[in-house]
Amino acid sequence: MNKKYLLLFVCGLLLSFTNAMAAVGNGVIKIKTNASKGQKIKMEMFIFGGWDEDGDALDNSPVYGDNFSVDGASNVTAAGNKVVMTADGPEITIHGDVDYLSIVGQGVTYIDVSKATELYELRVNENPITSIDLSNAPRLKVFWASNCKELATVSLENTPKLTGISLQGTQITALDLRNNPNLTSLNVGENQNLSSIDVTKLPALEELWVNGNGMEKLDVSKNTKLERLECSKNNLADLDVANNEKIEFLSCWGNKISGNSMDKLIASLVKETEGTEREFCVYNKLYDKEKNALTVAQAKAVKERGWTPKQATGTMDFFTWQAFDGDDATGINTATISHAADNVWYDLSGRRVAKPTQRGIYIHGGKKVVIR
């Protein structure tokens, strides 16, 4: 082959490569996993296909070798939006304009989406990843990394289009949301190291989960579009929802709200006049750290505002909510009283007393007893 034909051959190869890359797209996603060589990796994805007449993104199913390719893995197959591949090593690189990626429980330890310019939804739940930097994902709208038990840091610096975040059950200690004004759904529950969070810069927020975090304060005064608030299993001694007129579901059981603080919370509930069902899940006797207390009079006040006060029934592993008429002795969790000593009496403060002779309500044999 002379030099002229060799040059033409090389040019042809380069042109073919360039055309192939153009078809695949310019986006790049780099992933590291703890998968051993030969282990299957499963994920779901869609490829950006342009815009429709309404300005919404078009999703195309992935076609290997056509609109996406992979380095670091073999035996790649795609069916619908599901993709399966065999890892050749710990590092996998996906080429293509991926706009939706869900890789759940696949041993992901690292992911780089800084060059995934079309990515709008990322789900990496249940992976041993320790940190995620999304500061170069300006198109991202939805991000889930729930039950990533080792995840400690998340950077959201340049993600102004985010509307949904789920970071339930991680190790994060802080989350800066100042640059995410479009958030409508935020789930940061079951994060024992996240003792506080500022949601005052989230005017569009409609759903908020902060349950099980040990929080002592929660300010939702700026979240005027809030419809659902789950703040159970914290250390809240008070709560004010006066500015949340759209709220329809409030779950605040497992806190320390009682007496005057409960009166103030009830007074802050929007008064329902048009028949909208509004639930006030306030008490869970199955929870051994329950310190909320709702009296009969307070339950009546809740109903007068058009809400339904509710308590949990079932077991802590699986419980449902039922209407609650209040209990003037909700300060005692009878499930924690020993049944072994039938001659032992307690007052409603949980103090052991002699067999009572005065009128009142006492705890005896694990049951509430009224002495008249």
Q: Whereabouts are the PLM-identified features?
A:
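Residue-level detector of functionally pivotal "anchor" positions at catalytic/ligand-binding pockets or at interdomain
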Residues: R123, D325-S349
